[in-house]
Amino acid sequence: MRVVFMGTPDFAVGTLKAIIEAGHDVAAVVTQPDKPRGRSKSLVFSPVKDEAVAHGITVLQPERARDEAFVEELRTYNADVIVVVAFGQLLPASIINMPRYGCINVHASLLPKYRGASPIQWAVIDGCEYSGVTTMKMDEGLDTGDILMVEKVKLDAKETGGSLFDRLSDVGAHLLVKTLEGLEAGTITPVKQDDSESTYVKMLHKSFGKMDFNKSAAELERLIRGLNPWPSAFTYIDGKMLKIWDADVADNISEVQTEEVKPGQVVTVGKNTFTIACGQGYLVVNEVQLEGKKRMDSGSFLRGNQLEAGVMLGE
């Protein structure tokens, strides 16, 4: 097939590689404009652009994919299909309906659940048993197009947003190649989504990671995993941000009298861990990062910082 690929972040790179390796003709890659980064404000390529350049593929970077001039330029590539993976802009009907097989999107959830941004992190935060990848034929709605193929993935007990991201990126890559094969062979029957079963998730921001210890330890442990590596779960100690990278849940702590503790209070300090009271249960903290410092296990943190039972976190 003659393919135009539209994508921007790391998640999309694996799919682009898989399309190339499967022998499809990638006529062009469309990605977001280069972004200034760092103090020097030097322009940085998106991960997808890096991959396209490495393969000598033409790269297009429209400020607005809806602009008529870009739409007409895209038309000149005569694509059989446009593959869209985390591109970052909404597409007009003039692009969606342009190629013979339409625009095919790779979405990291089991649609119609978790439409929208950040479905990977939310699957972990919400404690889902399964996540997965859906390929769909795009329409003008937000992740509302007809379903083409689905692959489920069972989440591990200690799944993080980062580990699930990597797994679903790989799943999405091979599922998209299978989808292209099925479309070309005429063996796929698109299935309409059941809108009554749909859920939407919002984009994550750094502020979302602030831990509310009135919540249960189980909820907070999932938040920690879901926001690892970005934007990360955090609290404050003596006015400094303390990121919590790994923790376990404990229902009871034998040496603690429940009625004497408040949510957010450090209740035990051991050699290699410390424990925080929550609205329900306790968090046993295994790995942290104090503001301005590197990530470290809790034992290393406790050897370099004085922490005593009774200290309130979040202040």
From Swiss-Prot:
Family matches, as CDD domains: FMT_core_Met-tRNA-FMT_N, Met_tRNA_FMT_C
E.C. no: 2.1.2.9
Pfam families: Formyl_trans_C (PF02911), Formyl_trans_N (PF00551)
GO cellular component, one term: cytosol
Signal sequence segment: none
Alphabetical list of SUPFAM superfamilies matching this protein: FMT C-terminal domain-like, Formyltransferase
Example of a GO MF term: methionyl-tRNA formyltransferase activity
Record InterPro entries: Fmt (IPR005794), Formyl_trans_C (IPR005793), Formyl_transf_N (IPR002376), Formyl_transf_N_sf (IPR036477), Formyl_transferase-like_C_sf (IPR011034), GART_AS (IPR001555), Met-tRNA-FMT_C (IPR044135), Met-tRNA-FMT_N (IPR041711)
Catalytic activity line of the entry: L-methionyl-tRNA(fMet) + (6R)-10-formyltetrahydrofolate = N-formyl-L-methionyl-tRNA(fMet) + (6S)-5,6,7,8-tetrahydrofolate + H(+)
Domain of life: Bacteria
Enzyme category, top tier: transferase
Keywords associated with the record: Protein biosynthesis, Transferase
Binding site for (6S)-5,6,7,8-tetrahydrofolate: 109-112
Role this protein plays: Attaches a formyl group to the free amino group of methionyl-tRNA(fMet). The formyl group appears to play a dual role in the initiator identity of N-formylmethionyl-tRNA by promoting its recognition by IF2 and preventing the misappropriation of this tRNA by the elongation apparatus.
Family: Belongs to the Fmt family.
Protein name: Methionyl-tRNA formyltransferase
Source organism per UniProt: Lachnospira eligens (strain ATCC 27750 / DSM 3376 / VPI C15-48 / C15-B4) (Eubacterium eligens)
Gene: fmt
